[in-house]
Amino acid sequence: MGGGGHGGGITYKGVTVHTPKTWHTVTGKGLCAVMWFWILYRAKQDGPVVMGWRHPWDGHGDHGHGDHH
Protein backbone atom coordinates (compact mmCIF):
# COMPACT_ATOMS: atom_id res chain seq x y z
CA MET A 1 0.00 0.00 0.00
CA GLY A 2 2.60 2.58 1.08
CA GLY A 3 5.97 3.50 -0.30
CA GLY A 4 9.31 1.85 0.27
CA GLY A 5 11.14 1.34 3.51
CA HIS A 6 12.84 4.74 3.59
CA GLY A 7 13.02 6.68 6.83
CA GLY A 8 12.19 5.68 10.34
CA GLY A 9 8.88 4.66 11.70
CA ILE A 10 7.07 2.70 14.36
CA THR A 11 5.52 -0.66 13.53
CA TYR A 12 2.53 -1.83 15.56
CA LYS A 13 0.59 -4.98 14.65
CA GLY A 14 1.99 -4.96 11.13
CA VAL A 15 1.20 -1.30 10.42
CA THR A 16 4.15 1.06 10.06
CA VAL A 17 3.53 4.68 10.98
CA HIS A 18 6.28 6.87 9.61
CA THR A 19 7.51 9.92 11.48
CA PRO A 20 6.32 13.21 9.97
CA LYS A 21 8.70 15.69 8.42
CA THR A 22 9.56 18.77 10.44
CA TRP A 23 7.67 21.16 8.18
CA HIS A 24 4.53 19.03 8.53
CA THR A 25 4.78 19.25 12.32
CA VAL A 26 5.46 22.99 12.37
CA THR A 27 2.71 23.75 9.85
CA GLY A 28 0.22 21.61 11.74
CA LYS A 29 0.99 23.31 15.05
CA GLY A 30 0.76 26.74 13.42
CA LEU A 31 -2.61 26.01 11.83
CA CYS A 32 -3.84 24.56 15.12
CA ALA A 33 -2.84 27.76 16.92
CA VAL A 34 -4.61 29.91 14.32
CA MET A 35 -7.72 27.75 14.64
CA TRP A 36 -7.83 28.08 18.45
CA PHE A 37 -7.16 31.82 18.35
CA TRP A 38 -10.05 32.19 15.90
CA ILE A 39 -12.38 30.00 18.00
CA LEU A 40 -11.57 31.92 21.19
CA TYR A 41 -11.93 35.27 19.41
CA ARG A 42 -15.36 34.32 18.08
CA ALA A 43 -16.36 32.93 21.49
CA LYS A 44 -15.44 36.28 23.02
CA GLN A 45 -17.48 38.14 20.40
CA ASP A 46 -20.51 35.83 20.17
CA GLY A 47 -20.43 33.95 23.47
CA PRO A 48 -22.98 36.03 25.40
CA VAL A 49 -25.43 35.85 22.48
CA VAL A 50 -25.01 32.09 22.10
CA MET A 51 -25.42 31.56 25.85
CA GLY A 52 -28.55 33.74 25.88
CA TRP A 53 -27.06 36.40 28.18
CA ARG A 54 -27.84 39.22 25.73
CA HIS A 55 -29.53 39.80 22.41
CA PRO A 56 -27.48 40.47 19.25
CA TRP A 57 -29.00 43.94 18.89
CA ASP A 58 -28.28 45.03 22.48
CA GLY A 59 -25.37 47.29 23.28
CA HIS A 60 -24.33 48.33 19.81
CA GLY A 61 -24.19 51.95 20.96
CA ASP A 62 -25.86 53.44 17.88
CA HIS A 63 -28.53 55.84 19.13
CA GLY A 64 -28.44 58.18 16.16
CA HIS A 65 -32.04 57.64 15.05
CA GLY A 66 -33.54 60.31 17.25
CA ASP A 67 -33.62 58.13 20.38
CA HIS A 68 -33.24 60.37 23.40
CA HIS A 69 -33.24 58.63 26.75
From Swiss-Prot:
One of its GO terms (cellular component) is mitochondrial inner membrane. The keyword Electron transport applies. It is found in: Mitochondrion inner membrane. Its main location: mitochondrion. It is a peripheral membrane protein. The keyword S-adenosyl-L-methionine does not apply. Keywords: Electron transport, Membrane, Mitochondrion, Mitochondrion inner membrane, Respiratory chain, Transport. InterPro entries: NDUFB2_plant/fungi. Complex I is composed of at least 49 different subunits. Belongs to the complex I NDUFB2 subunit family. PANTHER family: NADH DEHYDROGENASE [UBIQUINONE] 1 BETA SUBCOMPLEX SUBUNIT 2 (PTHR36987:SF1), NADH DEHYDROGENASE [UBIQUINONE] 1 BETA SUBCOMPLEX SUBUNIT 2-LIKE (PTHR36987). Accessory subunit of the mitochondrial membrane respiratory chain NADH dehydrogenase (Complex I), that is believed not to be involved in catalysis. Complex I functions in the transfer of electrons from NADH to the respiratory chain. The immediate electron acceptor for the enzyme is believed to be ubiquinone. This is NADH dehydrogenase [ubiquinone] 1 beta subcomplex subunit 2.
